[in-house]
């Protein structure tokens, strides 16, 4: 507790103990010790007896004086750190640290020593090692000091960052499995700036500060984890961290990260949920501006584009462009804006392969995607439009057409074999579901059972699909619709994929009251957890069981229905309609 006081020539408890051990008159010895080590103010001596009269212990008085002086000293240290020339103030702080460092383990004076170190841009290495070696001191020191320790100790920095990265991934996954189902409030609803205010991003931003070396370390951790897990949320964090530093005008880092301006432009697109022509040209300029010998930057750009928020924006923009092309009667290959969106999508989707192979080349786009798949997708839009127009015609002008209920075999094959085709196809499914287009949805569902990399059963797609299906709530009363959706799609994967099981239960928790009773009973049996099911599935299933019980209690029993007397009410007379 009194460590370091002797080094400064200040008497401590050990000195008092020694004095009392060797003295013959203890009271005189104590009085002398108090005189020598008390507050040496002549005016104070006459005032102390008043404190005694009020029963104020000397310890309380001295502690109060000590706290006041320590606060003044902390203010003075902060003032020194901001006064005069840099060289002079750092010299003063170094001298102060040299004199006070021996007190660093004394709890009452530790804040002063830590404050001095905090304001030094370069703490002597010897002292940093002493701090690092002592867990208590390391925990107590300011982040400014820790940065100096971390930049030469990647493993220690990794230990600090790792729990934050785990927390971030858990938060993202938790958001995808949110019990709230809504087309308006979903995973992609928060604006980029709002997302950057999250705890993990803010903590990482503070830990990095203006230190380029630490920033590079975080990026390396994110690349490594992305390669190890294929988890795209690490790509989101990479973009969010850079933009968080951008918000704080940390030019030391923003000017050296070659992805800064590209990310800034893309961030604006994500905010608007659309890539307009002007920004599309800017993004193209960054890609075209990658010089020979600097191709490695494509790895980072692809990671920025692999961020689900970027993929979502690019995919939504692609669907919008395709609709415009239909109305303009233009082919996909004749639209430079569409081709650029596809180029950006391809780079984002190829991020893992690009970084893993270390072959930094833009992935080749399949010609058939543009010449066959997209025109085929546009033909589905035309089928839909034609049918809707026909339904609005007077009865005598209507053609006897039924809505097409099959997909071209080649269309399904594209969804299975090409990632780009699959991504665009899935976003078209989301688009028609949001449009409450039941016919188009039922036509496309069989094609989603087998898709490239099971993308139709990915958490992001299922999160968006279940949210959009809320708009078709009335259709769940129809057994045919439920059979197509559940038996024909969801239940083909739920036994082997726990995430699908969870998403189906989320959907039923929200819409159970709308589902046809016979179908609901069958679904409850089909979705019963097995011994291998995780806690999340069991919990959701239990909640569904409770909801269904409440639903049963609300319904009148057959006997109650029979006992309820019918009310014989006279029919009101209705006037005959006037002849037209």
UniProtKB/Swiss-Prot annotation:
Phosphoserine modifications at: 557
Tissue: Isoform 1 is expressed in the kidney, liver, adipose and lung. Isoform 2 is widely expressed.
GO biological process, one term: negative regulation of stem cell differentiation
A GO term from the CC aspect: NELF complex
A GO term, aspect molecular function: RNA binding
Region (Disordered): 552-580
Modified residues (N6-acetyllysine): 519
Domain of life: Eukaryota
Cellular compartment(s): Nucleus
Keywords: Acetylation, Nucleus, Phosphoprotein, Repressor, RNA-binding, Transcription, Transcription regulation
Keyword Acyltransferase: no
Outcome of gene disruption: Mice exhibit early embryonic lethality. Knockdown in embryonic stem cells (ESCs) leads to proliferation defects, increased differentiation, increased expression of development-associated genes and the dysregulation of genes involved in signaling and metabolic pathways. Mice exhibit cardiomyopathy, impaired response to cardiac stress and the reduced expression of metabolism-related genes in cardiomyocytes.
Main location group: nucleus
Family according to the record: Belongs to the NELF-B family.
Reported function: Essential component of the NELF complex, a complex that negatively regulates the elongation of transcription by RNA polymerase II (Pol II). The NELF complex, which acts via an association with the DSIF complex and causes transcriptional pausing, is counteracted by the P-TEFb kinase complex. May be able to induce chromatin unfolding. Essential for early embryogenesis; plays an important role in maintaining the undifferentiated state of embryonic stem cells (ESCs) by preventing unscheduled expression of developmental genes.
Subunit structure: The NELF complex is composed of NELFA, NELFB, NELFCD and NELFE; the N-terminus of NELFB binds to the NELFA:NELFCD subcomplex. Binds RNA which may help to stabilize the NELF complex on nucleic acid Interacts with the first BRCT repeat of BRCA1. Interacts with KIAA1191. Isoform 1 and isoform 2 interact with NELFA, NELFCD and NELFE.
Descriptive protein name: Negative elongation factor B
């Amino acid at each position: 507790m009194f460590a370091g006081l002797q080094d400064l020539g200040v008497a401590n408890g050990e000195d008092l103990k020694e004095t009392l051990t060797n003295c013959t008159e203890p009271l005189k010895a104590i009085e002398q010790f108090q005189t020598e080590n008390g507050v040496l103010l002549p005016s104070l001596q006459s005032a102390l007896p008043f404190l005694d009269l009020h029963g104020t212990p000397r310890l309380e008085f001295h502690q109060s004086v000590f706290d006041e002086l320590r606060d003044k000293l902390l203010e003075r240290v902060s003032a020194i750190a901001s006064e005069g020339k840099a060289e002079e103030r750092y010299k003063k702080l170094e001298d102060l640290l040299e004199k006070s460092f021996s007190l660093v383990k004394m709890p009452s004076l530790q804040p002063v020593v830590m404050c001095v170190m905090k304001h030094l841009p370069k703490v002597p290495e010897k002292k940093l090692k002493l701090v690092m070696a002592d867990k208590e001191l390391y925990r107590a020191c300011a982040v400014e000091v820790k940065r100096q320790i971390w930049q030469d100790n990647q493993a220690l920095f990794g230990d600090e960052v790792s729990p934050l990265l785990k927390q971030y991934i858990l938060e993202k996954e938790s958001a995808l499995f949110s019990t709230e189902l809504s087309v308006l409030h979903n995973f992609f609803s928060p604006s980029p700036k709002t997302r950057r205010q999250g705890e993990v991003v803010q903590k990482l931003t503070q830990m990095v500060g203006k230190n380029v070396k630490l920033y590079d370390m975080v990026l390396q951790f994110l690349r490594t984890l992305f390669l190890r897990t294929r988890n795209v949320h690490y790509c989101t964090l990479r973009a969010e961290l850079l933009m968080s530093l951008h918000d704080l005008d940390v030019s030391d880092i923003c000017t050296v990260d070659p992805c800064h301006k590209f990310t800034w432009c893309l961030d604006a697109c994500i905010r608007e949920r659309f890539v307009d022509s002007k920004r599309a040209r800017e993004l193209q300029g960054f890609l075209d501006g990658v010089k020979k010998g600097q191709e490695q930057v494509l790895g980072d750009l692809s990671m920025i584009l692999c961020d689900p928020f970027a993929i979502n924006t690019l995919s939504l923009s692609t669907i919008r462009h395709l609709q415009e092309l239909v109305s303009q009667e233009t082919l996909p290959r004749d639209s430079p804006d569409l081709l650029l969106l596809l180029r950006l999508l391809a780079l984002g989707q190829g991020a893992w392969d690009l970084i893993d192979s270390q072959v930094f080349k833009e992935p080749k786009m399949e010609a058939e995607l543009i010449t066959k798949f997209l025109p085929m997708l546009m033909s589905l839009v035309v089928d839909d439009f034609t049918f809707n127009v026909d339904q609005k015609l007077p009865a005598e002008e209507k053609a006897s057409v039924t809505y097409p209920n099959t997909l071209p075999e080649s269309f399904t094959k594209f969804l299975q074999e090409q990632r780009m085709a699959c991504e665009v196809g899935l976003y078209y499914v989301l688009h028609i579901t949001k449009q409450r287009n039941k016919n188009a949805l039922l036509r496309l569902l069989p094609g989603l059972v087998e898709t490239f990399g099971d993308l139709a059963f990915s958490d992001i797609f299922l999160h968006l699909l279940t949210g959009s299906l809320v708009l078709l709530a009335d259709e769940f009363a129809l057994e045919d619709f439920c059979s197509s959706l559940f038996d024909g799609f969801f239940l083909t994967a739920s036994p082997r994929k726990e995430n699908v099981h969870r998403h189906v239960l989320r959907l039923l928790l929200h819409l159970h009251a709308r589902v046809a009773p016979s179908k609901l009973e069958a679904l409850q049996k089909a979705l019963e957890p097995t011994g291998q099911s995780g806690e999340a599935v069991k919990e959701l299933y239990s909640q569904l069981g409770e909801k269904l019980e409440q639903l049963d209690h609300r319904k009148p029993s057959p006997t109650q229905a029979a006992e309820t007397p019918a009310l014989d009410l006279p029919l009101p007379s209705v006037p005959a309609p006037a002849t037209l």
